[in-house]
Amino acid sequence: MYDPLGLSIGSTNLVAACNGSTPVTRRAVLTLYPHCAPKVGMPNDDSDSDLKLSEPGTTMTGFVGRIGDSVALVSADGSTHDPDLLMVEALDAMVCAAGADSCSSEIAIAVPAYWKPGTVQALRDALRTHIGFVRSGMAPRLVPDSLAAMNAVNAELGIPVGGVVGLLDFGGSGTYVTLMDTGSDFEPVSATMRYLDFSGAEIDQALLLHVFEQVGHRGNLDPATTTGIGQLSQLRERCREAKERLSTDTVTELAVELPGCSTTIQVTRAQLDDLIQDRLTAFIYAFDDMLARNKTSWTDLTTVVTVGGGASIPLVRQRLSLHTRRPILTAKLPAASAATGALLLATRGERIDYRTKSSLGLLAAHAGGTGIIELPAGDVMVIDQDAMTDRELAWSQTEYGDVPVLLTRDPYDEEAPCWSMRLNLLEPAKDLPPRRRRRVRVSQVLIGLCAAVAMT
């Protein structure tokens, strides 16, 4: 008997969810130690954790965005590390943080829906190298985080059956929008739009600049030095924590520790709203443009589902509700929706055909620098069973996975769920006159024979 476990991978946070307990969230930071297993997250992620060790380790960041990259990550001490294996170690540390055992768990991992097939395959291959993640020769099931999040929200709040739903994932590196059909087991009906100008990192940066405006010239921070970089990173982390507190509180305090300046400033929710107002407006306009490109409108959506850490910001829900006039569904823990959905899929224990849940090789068109991707009518969508999606690239930039996909069913099964494809038939060549044979002159043959006799 295996216990179900759901994991989710984000650019800034990793989440683990298991039955009967609150999901565990850690920053996508891995600390390597020579005498013990690696630790995931920041020391202040959990006051009861064992991250606060007396001996400092080697801190690794940025490995989530480097999965599948052949170039190794270089740490501060000069050592090199494979980003794929770092991701596996971070996932294993998340399993331990959730109080589970990877060897005795039925694991489903929610990966970003915009990942390329090669990225997904690289993670799958790396998972097979870890004995804890390989049970009976099978690696954990990888699912798109969009599908996992929809299952989580549907189980908690109930999504109306029939019609199209707009899924908005407010993540740390950007906001991702996918139109999904609720009448076909949450099948995507559009390419995923990646909007990078409204993200958790951008909000943190805006709040950091606001702090510098409040502090003025009292701080003597030199960002060119190693000490200055460390102090700036700590201040940015405090800004992130203050942003998260303002999702439930109307005012919070932020400690500022800089060379020549040690103070505490107050930040209100109204100030944060002013900082993100323009970015949120630009995102809503980009969403309008995406709907128009897909020949739909807000009235065609049955509801709007918001997930991700940014969905907890009250202003986001207010603006979407006023603009769309549609019901807004947000889970109780939107940042953990993908992990919770992966847990539900692992609990079912059924094998789901994800060929219709993700796409590869979408013909895309970017317009006006908005990062919007459209699938023109009549174009062919190529489906990869094991890979997730390759949605963010234009057609001239699409990279196809170099790993062959095994056929697990009749490739000509017309009853299987799939996207309709338009076949380009080649017309047979017209009848051409018979090709004239080259004539060989008798004189040429005689000259050749004489030359051969002379040589002998």
Model-inferred region functions:
Residues 87-101, 149-156, 275-301, 316, ...:
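Phosphate/ATP-binding catalytic cores across multiple sugar-kinase/actin-like superfamilies
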Residues 1-24, 33, 154-189, 239, ...:
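Gly/Thr-rich phosphate-binding beta-strand-loop-beta motif of the actin/hexokinase/Hsp70
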Residues 1-73, 131, 194, 360:
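Early-domain small/polar-rich strand-loop-helix modules and first-structured segments
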Residues 435-456:
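Membrane-anchoring helices that localize proteins to membranes
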Residues 180-269, 340, 354-412, 447, ...:
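Phosphate-binding glycine-rich/basic clefts of nucleotide- and phosphate-handling proteins
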Residues 1, 140-168, 293, 339-354:
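Conserved phosphate-binding catalytic cores of ATP/NTP-utilizing and phosphoryl-transfer enzymes
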Residues 132-144, 317-343:
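Conserved phosphate-binding/catalytic loops in two-lobed NTP-binding clefts
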